[in-house]
Amino acid sequence: AQAVAAGAVAVLCAGPPPDVGAAVVETENPRRMMAVLAARLCGEPARAMTMIGVTGTKGKTTTAHLLAAILQADGRRVGLVGTNGVCWPGHRHDLNHTTPESCDLQALLRRMADDGCDACVMEVSSLGMKFDRAAGIEFDVGVFTNLSPDHIGPGEHADFAEYLHWKAALFQHCLLYTSDAA
């Protein structure tokens, strides 16, 4: 009801649809559906760029910045999303989360693509995965830095198993290249 009063024309919900005077979409996972809809409404901007997702307990920011610098040195126009904010040539914005909420993220990716970025390096936090902030993005490359028992507790993850689950979620749909005999 608050969303409709603020001007929303549709509501996503997980349970029986409330009578709010607007279109209601009942879905098992409203956050995931919001992310997928945001991607579609923004024209699926991630498809226009090489998307590189970086996850791990430590080293996401350093790794993301190094990857962006390597791509830039190769002549690529690169966007970067993470702990230090979001930036691409001529633009810089602060963020509230390492991995922004899906609607904000998709709008930022759209701006990057429209400004000619052909690659985006993105820190993908475990909470970003848990709350489906990156749902709807098909990463071309996934980077895993490491895993240690941090981010366990109220407001984050209940235990290490949950933390591991959300870290691994970045690689749920991936191909592994294993030509090395070792």
Predicted regions and their residues:
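N-terminal leader/targeting and accessory segments in enzymes
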Residues: 1-36, 40
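Short, well-ordered alpha-helix to beta-strand connector turns
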Residues: 8, 21-22, 139, 174-176
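Conserved small/polar residues in nucleotide/adenosyl-binding loops
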Residues: 177-182
